[in-house]
Each structure stands twice: as structure tokens, then as C-alpha cells.
From Swiss-Prot:
UniProt keyword annotation of Aminoacyl-tRNA synthetase present: yes
Binding site for ATP: 190-192, 200-205, 275-276, 319-322
InterPro entries recorded: aa-tRNA-synt_IIb, aa-tRNA-synth_II, aa-tRNA-synth_II/BPL/LPL, Anticodon-bd, Anticodon-bd_dom_sf, Gly-tRNA_synthase/POLG2, Gly_tRNA_ligase_bac, GlyRS-like_core
NCBIfam families: glyS_dimeric, PRK04173.1
UniProt-recorded name of the protein: Glycine--tRNA ligase
Coiled coil: none
Catalytic function, reaction form: tRNA(Gly) + glycine + ATP = glycyl-tRNA(Gly) + AMP + diphosphate
Lineage: Bacteria, Bacillati, Mycoplasmatota, Mycoplasmoidales, Mycoplasmoidaceae
């Protein structure tokens, strides 16, 4: 298995190079809140672009929508979130810390399985627990200006419900057959009582969710198709290390209240093997619930078989921050090179925040190298320019932030109009004429995945 470092290694690395840092740091921070810096914001955007290109772009049976964070509060009643979206928590009476029951014992799938006599507090080692209590994870807020007219609403805990409530409109808009998918990117919010483990569990996060509407008899076929698609995306597009990923199918007694079948793609994060991407057969639960509460029909008419039915839903759901974190863990390595520690981020070329960097060998060549940088900046590639420091230190920085190719503009370049290209992973160097650079990079672009 590839080496997985401690969480602190990744936190410090990402902060050092401006990928991710503590949010509100000027005011001593806010727990479990993170800002994406210049490199992190670009990498996050490239992950979203890769998701869009693979799952949505040019797919005749997939639609992309964008719905609000605040929805009619009745939606959360219909979906079951008001009643069921809770964590079972206990307090250690000795040290006053609060824990999720399922985090104290991973064998526990429901609060009814909790046996306090068998578990000691991980902080103070005492065995002095409070009663189990359920805490709802929905963030509450109000809309309205006048106090007497204010209305209680919730920040969405998932993007899925915004898709379900638009099913009929999308169906009528396109008159499309089943199955078809609807995708959405967007922020979601969960009032996690015990968030933590860096980007893995935060209160505000971005999701990519798809809802595949299908005939209930075809849901297994759709499920298996999406399972294969997720695996392809993780291993071929993001190029995650397969040794760090495991698929886990839930037993019947582990399933969420809405699910008929669930498979999680688990990833070896620093704190353990945890969920990266969930795939669930939600059955007909969602549309039936919204039909019941809205009192409006959400059925589908199958003209070929002359029958009406409520479609089943198959849902792939992933958090962008978790994908980001997994990509860093899978790609980041520390190794010895020429007696020094080399940090390298082995990202696929299409994901690199900075794909190519232009490096003048010395300051005297800076102006001419700048002309080359400006020419390459007219292409679709993400180009950087670095002139400060020795060429060796600039190579090290480029490796650390994942830059795939470094172009060195030296004194010979003035004479032969060629430059040296150094490849990040193999460290091989090749001399390429400047006039052929665009063609050379086009040949080495992995965008065709």
C-alpha cells in the first residue's frame, strides 16, 4: 500500500503552499472551517470540471440543474430529515467531552446497540457516560423582516431534495424516457456536533450528487452501471491509488431509512478507512414522500407498456472536499533526492493547478523568458512563471505543488531557440524547439481520458 502520512503532515503541507488554511485565522479561527487558497481553489475547480466532463457533458440522458440552499421547510418534513436526520451522542461525565456513539464503537450501527459498560472514554479512559441523546443536524435560520412574520427554515443538508422536487418539471420539459439522470453541484450544511479530521467532516461543504430516475425493475442495472462509472472516475480520471480504495456493501440492518441497497467507496484517510463516495438505491421513497406531502402526482407514464408508476432513484453522492483530500493523500509523497527530502504531488496533468512553469535560468534571461510565458499563456494550459531563487529550489517548489512540466530557459536558448523540459515524476529532461512547444505539450496532455 502507498504510504499514508499523519493528518498533520497534510495540514502543514497544504498550508505551506497555499492550498488550504484555517478560516477566520485573523480572529483565531473557527473550528473545522477551512479556506481554499490560490492553488487549492484551482485544484478544487479542476475536480469539479472533471466531474462535469465525465458525468454530465455531452450526455443526452443527464441534465444539470442548480437549486437554492434554502427551500420550503415542508420539503425536509417530507424527506424525513426533520424526524431522522440525527446523530446519537453521549457525554463523558468525567471529562465533559461529547462523542458520537458510532465513533466510539465502529461496530455500532444504531443507538440501540450501545453498551456503555463495554466502552471507555478515549480521552480520559473513564467509564462514566450520560444517556444517549439524539441531536438533529439541520441548521436552522429564519426568513422575514418583521418578527411576527418570521418563518423557520433550514439550510439544506444535501442537494438531492432540490432535484426530487423538480422531477415533474424536468420530465415535462424534455419528454425524456427512463432512465435519465439529474446532477447538481452545491453547498450543503450539517450541524455536526463532533466534526473534525481536517477536510473529511466539516459543517459547510460542497457536494456533487446525481439522481437517476428509473423503472424500479431496472434499478439494479442502473446501480451497477453507476458503480462502474464511479470506479472508472476514481481510478482513471483522478488516478487515485487503487490500494487505498475499498468498496463496501451495507447489510440490510445498516441501510438508511430510504435505501434498498448501498455501496460505499471507502478511502484510506489518515484517520482510517472512511466513506469517500456513496451509491444508494433509494427506491421510490423520495418521490412517494413528496407526492404524499405536496399532494401532487409524481408518477411516470410508460407509453410502451401503458402503465403508471413511481420511478425509483439511484443516487451517487460525493463531497468535493473529501475528493480533494483523497487526491492529496493519494498523490503526495516524500522521498530522498540527492541527499535532500523532496516533496512531490503526482497529480494527473489535467488536474494540476499549475500545469507548466517557465523558469529563466538566471535573472538576465528573465525578460526573454517572460515573452515565452506570455505566448504559452494564450493556450488553454495553466502556466506559471518563477524567477526567484536557484533553479534547484524552483524545481523543488514545482514538484511540491504538482507542476507536471518545468521549462528552463537558459543561455543556449538564445542561440538555438530551444528549451529544456523537465518532467515531474521521471525527472527526465528533453530539449524541445520553442516553435514546437505547443505541439509537444498537446502530445503529452492527458485530457483525452
Amino acid at each position: 500500500m502507498a504510504q499514508v502520512y499523519s493528518q498533520e503532515v497534510y495540514v502543514q503541507y497544504l498550508k505551506r503552499y497555499g492550498f488550504v488554511f484555517q478560516s477566520s485565522e485573523l480572529y483565531n479561527g473557527l473550528a473545522n472551517s477551512w479556506d481554499f487558497g490560490p492553488l487549492g481553489a484551482v485544484l478544487k475547480q479542476q475536480i469539479k470540471t472533471a466531474l462535469y466532463n465525465f458525468f454530465i457533458k455531452n450526455k443526452r440522458d443527464v441534465l444539470l440543474i442548480d437549486t437554492p440552499i434554502i427551500l420550503n421547510e415542508q420539503i425536509w418534513k417530507a424527506s424525513g430529515h426533520l424526524a431522522n436526520f440525527t446523530d446519537a451522542l453521549v457525554d463523558c461525565k468525567s471529562c465533559k467531552l461529547r462523542f458520537r456513539v458510532d465513533h466510539l464503537d465502529e461496530q455500532i450501527k444504531s443507538a440501540t446497540q450501545w453498551n456503555p459498560k463495554q466502552v471507555n472514554c478515549p480521552n480520559c479512559k473513564a467509564n462514566n457516560w450520560s444517556e444517549v441523546r439524539d441531536f438533529n443536524l439541520l441548521f436552522q435560520t429564519e426568513i422575514g423582516v418583521v418578527n411576527s412574520e418570521k418563518r423557520l427554515v433550514y439550510l439544506r443538508p444535501e442537494t438531492a431534495q432540490g432535484i426530487f422536487i423538480n422531477f415533474k418539471q424536468l420530465l415535462q420539459l424534455k419528454k425524456r424516457p427512463l432512465p435519465f439522470g439529474v446532477a447538481q453541484f452545491g453547498k450543503s450544511f450539517r450541524n455536526e456536533v463532533t466534526p473534525g479530521n481536517f477536510l473529511f467532516r466539516v459543517r459547510e461543504f460542497e457536494q456533487f450528487e446525481m439522481e437517476w430516475f428509473c423503472n424500479p425493475q431496472a434499478s439494479l442495472s442502473v446501480f451497477e452501471s453507476q458503480q462502474q462509472a464511479i470506479a472508472h472516475f476514481l481510478f482513471k480520471v483522478l488516478q487515485l491509488n487503487p490500494a487505498l480504495v475499498k468498496q463496501y456493501e451495507y447489510d440490510k440492518n445498516e441501510l438508511a431509512h430510504y435505501a434498498n441497497k448501498t455501496v460505499d467507496f471507502l478511502f484510506q484517510f489518515p484517520h482510517g478507512l472512511r466513506e469517500l463516495w456513496g451509491l444508494a438505491d433509494r427506491g421510490t421513497f423520495d418521490l412517494e414522500q413528496h407526492q404524499k406531502y405536496a399532494k401532487k402526482p409524481l408518477d411516470f407514464f410508460d407509453g410502451e407498456n401503458n402503465e403508471h408508476f413511481i420511478p425509483a432513484v439511484v443516487e451517487p453522492s460525493v463531497g468535493i472536499e473529501r475528493l480533494f483530500y483523497a487526491l492529496i493523500v493519494s498523490s503526495y509523497q516524500q522521498e530522498q533526492l540527492e541527499g535532500e527530502m523532496r516533496e512531490v504531488l503526482r497529480l494527473p496533468f489535467h488536474l494540476c493547478p499549475e500545469q507548466i512553469v517557465v523558469l529563466p535560468l538566471v535573472n538576465k534571461l528573465k525578460e526573454t523568458a517572460q515573452t515565452l510565458f506570455e505566448a504559452l499563456s494564450q493556450t488553454h494550459w495553466r502556466i506559471g512563471f518563477e524567477s526567484a531563487g536557484s533553479i534547484g529550489k524552483r524545481y523543488r517548489k514545482a514538484d511540491a505543488i504538482g507542476t507536471k512540466f518545468a521549462i528552463t530557459f537558459d543561455f543556449e536558448s538564445l542561440e538555438d531557440q530551444a528549451v529544456t523540459i523537465r518532467e515531474r515524476d521521471s525527472l527526465k529532461q528533453v530539449r524541445v524547439p520553442i516553435k514546437e512547444l505547443k505541439a509537444w505539450f498537446a502530445q503529452h496532455d492527458d485530457q483525452s481520458h
